């Protein structure tokens, strides 16, 4: 049987990022053959990823990549905020974003397939389920800028614009803070407006106001509603005395489109009863 040296284990660990004991066991199984040991670990990594696939991944980070006139914003999920802060996990998320910008995949499934080997490797290293939840690519003749909020990288935006990068970045910060649904009123679908109009009309009628007054109330509320949900209509967070549209115009900048994500939006997190887990473990 081949001798398994500390250097062999260290080299395999450096190549795979896995634990010392896992690497040593793989080398023993491979009878000292480095390539075979690496293959064994890759196979086991895939099996481990499969076992973890059913576990909810609701934490994670956002990452972006801009490759010329192509930009991508991605959300990559894991199970705990502890792993979300791990440098290896963050590096994987950045790799996913770079891959999305370079390859411009048509779906999450296609992007996931492109990064599957790297996903299995980081799952094997960190021991949590991970997944590419969503992404968006903007391929444009215009300019692109991204803003990721805070060290935890859980909220962010990719902005397509014309004009000043500094101004566009400030507007990106506003988008993360104020959460507009779209750029302008023209992008709000008629069904949404009519639904709001119906609600406001019923409220006005119920208040007993005269018809002409009620109609003015409804139109006023519609204008307020549109201002609240559109980027251009919102009061600019850095100067509430002007709208984003006014700030943009006076600084020679126009936002064409944006995509905004917040990690975990819409994912139901499983409540963990740690006391029950400890009690169950004590019975084993």
Curated annotation (Swiss-Prot):
Any one Gene Ontology cellular component term annotated for this protein: cytoplasm
HAMAP family per UniProt: EF_Ts (MF_00050)
GO molecular function: translation elongation factor activity
Compartments, record wording: Cytoplasm
UniProt xrefs under InterPro entries: EF-Ts_dimer_sf (IPR036402), Transl_elong_EFTs/EF1B (IPR001816), Transl_elong_EFTs/EF1B_dimer (IPR014039), Transl_elong_Ts_CS (IPR018101), UBA-like_sf (IPR009060)
Protein name, entry field: Elongation factor Ts
This protein's UniProt keywords: Cytoplasm, Elongation factor, Protein biosynthesis
One BP annotation, GO: translational elongation
Task performed by this protein: Associates with the EF-Tu.GDP complex and induces the exchange of GDP to GTP. It remains bound to the aminoacyl-tRNA.EF-Tu.GTP complex up to the GTP hydrolysis stage on the ribosome.
Family the entry assigns: Belongs to the EF-Ts family.
Species of provenance: Neisseria meningitidis serogroup B (strain ATCC BAA-335 / MC58)
